[in-house]
Amino acid sequence: MMSFDIKCRPEFALLTVEVPEGKKLFVEASAMAWMSANMKMRALFKGGLRRFISKESLFISEFEAQGFAGEVAIAPGPSGDIGHLSLNNQTVYISSSSYVAHTEGVSYETKFQRLSQGLLSGAGWFLIKMVGTGDVWFNSYGALESLDVSDNLTIDNGHIVAFTEGVEYDIVRLGGYKSLLFSGEGFVCKFRGQGKVFIQTKKPASLISWANAYRPVKSSRA
């Protein structure tokens, strides 16, 4: 486990990780705020061309401490908190927009979950499967909450940040297409099993919808 600190939480969380000499830290692309002079950085591309086209690829940055231990400070894009899990030969699934960083010993793969056929064909939910032993960090838009899944739990897709192994889910449309078009409610995840789901109290789609109402609109002239 790497030593780390999370400051400025919960609204504007900043993650600082101490990377031991010779060790590597993997971070969301472009999220590095600052780093020690001895840190070597290189870009990685996971997934290949086919997955890039289908949006299943993942861009990350690799940081390696050379000569002695160094630090990397990470500032995720959304305004919110940062969560941490220490995996011990375990699995966690993270929404792609919530991934922040992970250490060596944890492998990852991407999964594109299609939400529908027809009206929203092509829309989907991009998950990152993290497996192994090490540290994993993820961020939220708004506050971060942990919910226990002991039986069944229904959560709006836009609020899901991550969930642990032991939890299964089905993606369903809530209330049919009329609800999707007129109420703003769309797809939800129905979780079952035993485990935890991490949610965010805000979702980007709601912010976009709210801001759109104040968008200047040019009046048409006859």
Language-model segment annotations:
Residues 1-222:
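Composition-driven recognition of glycine/serine/threonine/acidic- and proline-rich low-complexity segments
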